[in-house]
Amino acid sequence: EFYIMALPSDKDAMRLAIYENKEISGGDNEAAAKKADQKTQLLLKILGDMQQNDKISASTNLTEVLHKAAKGSGLPMRKVGQAPFFVLRGAGMPAVLIEMGYLTDPAEARKLSSQSYLYSICSSFASGIVTYVKEHPVVAD
């Protein structure tokens, strides 16, 4: 098996790391084990923050490409923002939430019920996704 310094890939990997770290940090010495565990928890937090920053960066790049594609097609895209939406958490890839209008606004509801308008939106986003994938090729595991 191969391991790299990163967040644990599964529970077994975490258990193994805790066991091995315990052996290196003083075996059954409870104080040493507790200190090592605190260091491990801090490291996991730092690695999690780094992975989150990478995900935010990739999501920002995708958002910029999609925003540009939508604006280029004449769609009214207001702004690019950031917020901790639940539906965006835990995605292992760039993730974007796109608000296309409000059904409570009669004018926007009419647009959103138009097949040609929806086709235009979908075409713009599909074009943006293709552009993003070409600019950021996926590396297989």
Question: Where would I find each of the regions flagged by the language model?
Answer:
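Active-site-proximal helix/loop segments of hydrolytic enzymes
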Residues: 1-141
